[in-house]
Amino acid sequence: MRRISRNEKAVRGSMRVNGRDIATLENADYIIPDGTYPVSVTFSPRFKRMLPLIGNVPGRSGIRIHRGTKPEHSKGCILVSAAMEQQLTAEWLALQASNEPIKIIIDNEN
């Protein structure tokens, strides 16, 4: 995932998954530090559905990739469109079932 632009409230980025570019949005107050993190798909009690969970984020837990359209919809999670949330979850569940490791690389361009 690359962060492309930032203002006082939001950080916009792009995540490349299986050849597709997916728009991302983060709350500027809660961005994840640059690095490589493991991803697993687990049930979220808060959202009541299966969602990607980003692991090993320093000092944080429960960081998800989920749908949202405004930076206020996140307290540290990566936001994507509703359609992309469903596709990512389905694709990553299949990878997880085949024991393929899933990771996200976060890189700050700005």
Q: What is each stretch, according to the model?
A:
Residues 1-110:
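Cell wall/extracellular polymer interaction/catalysis modules
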